[in-house]
Amino acid sequence: MKVIQAKSAGFCYGVQRAVELAEQTARERGGCVMLGSIIHNAHVVQHLEQLGAHQVAGPEEIRPGDTVLIRAHGEKKQVIGHLKDIGAECVDATCPNVLRVQQIVAQADAEGRVPIIIGDPNHPEVMGVASWSARSVVFEGAETLQRWLDEDPARRELPLTAVAQTTCIRIIWDGAAEILKKQCTNAKIFDTICNATHKRQSEAAELASQVDVMVVVGDRKSANTKHLTEICSRQCPAVYQIERAEELKRDFLTGCSVAGLTAGASTPAGIIKEVYTTMSEEIKTMEPTEESFEEMLEKSFKTLNTGEKVTGIVTAVGPTEVQVDLGCKQAGY
């Protein structure tokens, strides 16, 4: 039995940049304010709070002069404006890929186009992107997009600009994009799924198809971790999403020959290593100990001494003797 870890598991560039910027800001400023979770990982947020980065739930808790970290998912345009108006200093940790999507939507708005966003309408990244145009419409996938188009056939003639949540599942985006290509007459389509996400999802799907059990590590609030779990579940019958090694259960690996391991973009390397080590140790304790050829050969040459007490198996009974297997080259009569 063995464990195979996906090469792309762990922090992506955008998350790494955000965490490093948060650490640097907290140290240099003697503390700062995080507007929401800078990334979706409770353990990282706890680490940053220990450095002096205090988390608040909303902009109403921020005071003039505060140094405010904008999370990797980005923030609503109106919130950024409010922070500047009250005199707060913004340190922007928004992922560059998310910034690009915001810019595309802002440009579409300036051109009078209708931004179509494929993603989770309740995710902070999507809410932030949508805020750059009052005309933005968000769809979770092809089904809801198709329903919107069918409600008013004239919408197929609208000037549309389509983008994806950067962590969107590829098959969901492709389905929506195909509808726009075939049914709409004036649609600009931008594939904004980031390369790291695409690589991670493709690798996870391939690995999941080759293993008996797949373990996905990441915070339960993490969209990309959730998507990895969904993707792996299409390829592997036994998929488990956990946050830490402590959540691993022995029965996860029962009857498993090969186990796979991947992790979301906001999962620290230390946690991934911890899970990998725990899985490897668990597998070792489950594997039966096999005797080497030398050990078996040595046992076969074992000699017995007169008066020695041994245990054997009766193999034959005759009129004048009983034959006993003593587990060596000698037999007892």
In which residue ranges do the predicted regions lie?
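Single-stranded RNA-binding regions, centering on S1/OB-family and related RNA-binding modules
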Residues: 284-333
